[in-house]
Amino acid sequence: MIARAALACFAALLLAGCVALPPQTAALQARPPADLPARTERAEVPFFAQTRDHCGPAALATALADIGLPADPDRLADAVFLPSRAGSLQIEMLGGARRQGAVATRLPRELEALLREVAAGHAVVVLQNLGLDWLPRWHYAVVVGYDLAERELVLRSGTDKRATISLRTFEYTWARGGRWAITVLPPDKLPAMATEADAQEAAVGFERAAPPAQAALAYRTLLARWPGNLLAGIGLGNTLNAAGDTAGARAAFETVTERHDSAVAWINLARLRLDAGDAAGARTAAERAVQRADAAEPAWRDMARTTLAATNAR
């Protein structure tokens, strides 16, 4: 009797959870954003049916193919699928996209952000938990459309090329998956809804996997939206230098030092000027590096002084 009562109570809780609208869905339905299209679907997004537990490789292949990059789920499985986990971890999905030449960027944990990203023309890879918190069943899918009037999303999911799911159900499953969502885009494009911090993290991660010239393009793209981003400015200078464009690297670090009093930027500028035969300009930059390091960035003090000594030796 006690067991039956407990089971009945548990069932009632589940039913109550399914009936109630989750908060973000409720907000969207109560106050649909006036500037958000009521319906969008990108029917042209490719589809790769999932095989075995390979929803991660299939979803990643879908996103890569959508931007014209090589997309073979079987080959991607070798890179992102972990047999011991019978699935793909988020970090493997990010790395797999970057190794294929795409910038994978985290999106805000908001349902509206997903809809706006799709409205901007970008497929969105999401992680759902189709089970329960204590009995998870992880699943990757790709959001390719939505209909606010019908209150549903359109997904590339599993073996279904056009799976529809209610906003309510999706939010429950997405929330249980940590509200994880990414865009997979070429380095000359940014997600519509990414924050500066997430775009910066994505560019830095891309640099670790991409050729220097492609990484430089990603930093240029980020700087076009956030021109004052210090890390992106330094990253642009470093990747241009690694790509052999020393003149471009010097120009990049000159721009950084015009915006920021950064010891590492001054050090890099001094070295590039020295390599170009501009001893006087190098010395000026090195002196600024020492001043900044002494004043606020002691971690760079030794390198700044070493750089200054090198300029004095010329």
What is each PLM-predicted segment?
Residues G235, N268, D302-M303, T307:
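Canonical tetratricopeptide repeat
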Residues A232, A265-W266, A299-W300:
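TPR alpha-solenoid repeat register
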Residues L14-G17:
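C-terminal motif of bacterial Sec signal peptides marking the signal peptidase cleavage site
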Residues V19-E110, L114, A120, D188-K189, ...:
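Cysteine-nucleophile protease catalytic domains, especially the papain-like/related folds used
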Residues V19-A27, A149-G235, N241:
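Noncatalytic regulatory segments and standalone regulatory/sensor domains
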Residues V103, L107-R156:
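Active-site-adjacent substructure of cysteine-protease-like catalytic cores
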